[in-house]
Amino acid sequence: MPTSWKNMTLNFWKTMSDSLKPQLLEYALGPALRAFSTTRQGGVSRDNYASFNINAYCGDEADSIRQNKQALCDELGIEPQRLIMPHQTHTACVRVVDEAFFASSAAEQQAALEGVDALITDQTRLCIGVSTADCVPVVLADKDQRVVAAIHAGWRGTQAGIAANAVETMCRTFNLRAADLRAVIGPSISMQAFEVGQEVYDAFAATGQFPMSQIARRYPSKEGAEKWHIDLWAANFLTLEQCGLPMEHIQVSGVCTYAQFDRFFSARRLGINSGRIFTGIMKK
């Protein structure tokens, strides 16, 4: 991986004057697509959920979540039932959202989204997305903008190869080539901020899939002793590249959630009972 990879960023802010509308970090993956990450601005949630959170699994008030979700759907021009997010559990499980999904009952849909950390679809006017607050969100699209994916890659999912699983499932299911995919790695914790224990380093090293000298370094901790830091941006970049995506097809937002917790939710800064970034992608 070249040393210049971190310069491959796309930071286009879409700022709205109306404070009750979400402010989005948008990604240019093609004119037929809408890809973005929400910021903390533009919603009605309070305290550590302020102000734009649509995740129902982190302790926010249900009415605030409903209002925020409706505001995002209004911005996207879709109905709330066309915004799909899984109940993530740090797995490497990938789910395809197709016509059969919508033909199933609400209970069946909920069950299908349980324990899933990546979604893929070829459906139009359907926004799929994942929730993060330091973990890495990744969005994918093929060059013809026919199929899209959203991936939640925490350290466990990254180590387990969820990005590779998503690429493989996307290509196999829809007869695509990895070389024709584009990817964006969204706001998440940087290596400098992501201090980990020896067990996390060992988990990555044990896979044999990661060049540890490129994704891990030791820095002095607050206590003085050196601790391992893992570069999740680099780990996911390398995984995508190993899958066959050309490096020039992989953009990195370069936004560290830990450093910019005033704009993006960070669980390490705010605690686990706080809001989540929603990173979504849809075919218009």
Task: For the regions a language model picked out, list residue spans one by one.
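Active-site microenvironment for binding and transforming phosphate-containing groups
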Residues: 2-284
